[in-house]
């Protein structure tokens, strides 16, 4: 078998990432050696591979679904937004510079097609099947000429295309039809059919519409996936990241102790790796809320200032909203505060930034004895250490170099009183350390909260991935899906007018 498939979507957040992961997990359970691939990802949620390459966090999650180690070839182009109109371009795991959207789509993107096709060929030469994820919609007619992630990669590699639509939003039939009808004939010939995502109710009520869609397009529907809570793992930061006010709470089990523990995460601009708090939200009795007002910190037992692609901008935002003063008051009252990566940097005394914001000298919040200087060379590394008497693993992704001048050691950073800071993403996924940290927070907050002794974040993640595989196995036509991956799109698929504009 030397198969492949592109999972496209009618919109951003249609479910491409989780459907791709589900197909990967289903295939690996059939004994197929499979890998994920996304030619170009725009995300602030990233991950560091074992050899120090930066890729999208979603592709790392999909690699886990495949039970393989993630590599840079699985996400050769990563765009990390730094503002409304520019992004850092990460090529094969290494940053190569900042670029405006106009500059990127004006020619640079098209020149990267060869690079992404080479990465895909590398994977296809190693694995039995490669399941590719598209981005946004393949029918973005203004971007088709320079597309390297949807029909550009499908046509370049001869991949069949499965279009995913989120029926929970409404309008899925128009979205399916319109997506195909706006593609050029050569692109339409690769679109094999559709997959309905997030359906609620009786599937028999949907079947007449699916039959009509087949009559209109000549393309079949490969499955109807039911709506399932708790499967938005390692989400990208498109539509889902309107996080202000969002609550993440464990659905695993009730609290072990008498009290819950309330965690407030400051929803700073350009928030990166907000998945850091998923391990907290998986703990029974921990309620995580994303906040943007100082009064929302009042009843929080722990405040987290998360990572951000714009440390200085986040610092300004905290000050403008009154959150900086509220955090400083908490620290003075010895109420728990945790800064991660950019959040750690802004808790320090001084920031010198001629790289990210080019703001030069900026005063931090002064809560930790740390001085930060931004370096053009990005730190990308896996980290292993110990804190609170427990082993910890994490990873670092940052331009800021921190000089710690005091306080008590805490991972790579420090702590003063009940204020902690570290560059390490992912540290809270280490179960023993997470429990020890939550015990400290609960004691400082006066809460009768007890961490569950047996919560394994890695095991919960595996359960989630298995549930995604189950969705495909039980609710998709897996025989037809297998043929599609192995043999490509059916021959003779009809053209749906009007096609792509000239």
UniProtKB/Swiss-Prot annotation:
Q: Which GO terms describe its biological process?
A: cobalamin biosynthetic process
Under which pathway is this protein filed? Cofactor biosynthesis; adenosylcobalamin biosynthesis
Start and end residues of each GATase cobBQ-type domain? 260-433
Q: What are the protein's GO molecular function terms?
A: ABC-type vitamin B12 transporter activity; catalytic activity
Q: Does the keyword Glycoprotein apply?
A: no
Active site at 341, 425
The cross-references to InterPro entries, in alphabetical order and at most eight, read: Class_I_gatase-like (IPR029062), CobQ/CobB/MinD/ParA_Nub-bd_dom (IPR002586), CobQ_GATase1 (IPR033949), CobQ_N (IPR047045), CobQ_synth (IPR004459), GATase_3 (IPR011698), P-loop_NTPase (IPR027417)
| UniProt KW Zinc keyword | no
Q: Which UniProt keywords apply?
A: Cobalamin biosynthesis, Glutamine amidotransferase
Give the protein's biological function. Catalyzes amidations at positions B, D, E, and G on adenosylcobyrinic A,C-diamide. NH(2) groups are provided by glutamine, and one molecule of ATP is hydrogenolyzed for each amidation.
NCBIfam families linked: cobQ (TIGR00313), PRK00784.1 (NF001989)
Say which family it is in.
Belongs to the CobB/CobQ family. CobQ subfamily.
- Write down what this protein is called: Cobyric acid synthase
Q: Which organism is it from?
A: Streptomyces coelicolor (strain ATCC BAA-471 / A3(2) / M145)
């Amino acid at each position: 078998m030397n198969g492949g498939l592109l999972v496209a979507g009618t919109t951003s957040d249609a479910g491409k990432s989780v459907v791709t992961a589900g197909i990967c997990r289903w295939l690996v359970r059939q004994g197929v050696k499979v890998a994920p691939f996304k030619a170009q990802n725009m995300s602030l949620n990233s991950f560091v591979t074992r050899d120090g390459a930066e890729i999208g966090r979603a592709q790392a999650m999909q690699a886990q679904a495949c039970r393989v180690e993630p590599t840079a070839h699985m996400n050769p182009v990563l765009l990390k937004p730094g503002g409304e109109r520019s992004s850092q371009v990460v090529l094969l795991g290494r940053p190569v510079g900042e670029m405006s959207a106009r500059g990127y789509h004006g020619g640079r993107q098209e020149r990267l097609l060869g690079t992404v096709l080479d990465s895909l060929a590398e994977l296809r030469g190693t694995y039995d099947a490669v399941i590719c994820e598209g981005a946004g919609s393949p029918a973005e007619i203004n971007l088709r000429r320079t597309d390297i992630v949807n029909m550009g990669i499908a046509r370049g590699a001869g991949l069949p295309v499965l279009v995913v639509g989120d029926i929970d939003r409404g309008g899925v039939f128009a979205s399916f039809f319109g997506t195909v009808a706006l593609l050029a004939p050569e692109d339409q010939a690769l679109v094999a059919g559709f997959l309905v995502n997030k359906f609620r109710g009786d599937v028999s009520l949907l079947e007449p519409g699916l039959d009509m869609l087949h009559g209109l397009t000549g393309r079949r529907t490969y499955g109807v996936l039911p709506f399932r809570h708790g499967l938005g793992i390692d989400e990208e930061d498109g539509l889902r990241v309107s996080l202000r006010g969002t609550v993440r709470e464990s659905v695993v089990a009730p609290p072990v102790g008498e009290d819950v523990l309330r965690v407030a995460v400051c929803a700073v601009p350009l928030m990166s790796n907000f998945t850091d708090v998923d391990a907290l939200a998986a703990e029974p009795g921990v309620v995580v809320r994303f906040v943007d007002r100082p009064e929302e910190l009042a009843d929080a037992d722990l405040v987290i200032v998360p990572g951000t692609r714009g440390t200085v901008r986040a610092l300004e935002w905290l000050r403008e909203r009154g959150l900086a003063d509220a955090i400083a008051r908490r620290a003075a009252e010895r109420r728990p505060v945790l800064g991660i990566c950019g959040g750690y940097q802004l808790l320090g005394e001084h920031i010198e930034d001629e790289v990210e914001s080019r703001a030069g000298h900026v005063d931090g919040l002064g809560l930790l004895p740390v001085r930060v200087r931004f370096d053009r060379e990005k730190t990308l590394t896996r980290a292993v250490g110990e804190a609170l008497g427990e082993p910890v693993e994490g990873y670092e992704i940052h331009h800021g170099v921190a000089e710690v001048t005091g306080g008590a050691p805490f991972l790579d950073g420090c702590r003063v009183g009940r204020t902690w800071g570290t560059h390490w993403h992912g540290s809270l996924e280490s179960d023993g350390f997470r429990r020890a940290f939550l015990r400290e927070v609960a004691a400082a907050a006066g809460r009768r909260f007890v961490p569950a002794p047996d919560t394994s974040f890695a095991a919960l993640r595996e359960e989630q991935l298995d549930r995604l595989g189950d969705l495909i196995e039980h609710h998709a036509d897996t025989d037809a899906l297998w043929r599609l991956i192995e043999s490509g799109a059916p021959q003779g698929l009809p053209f749906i007018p009007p096609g792509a504009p000239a």
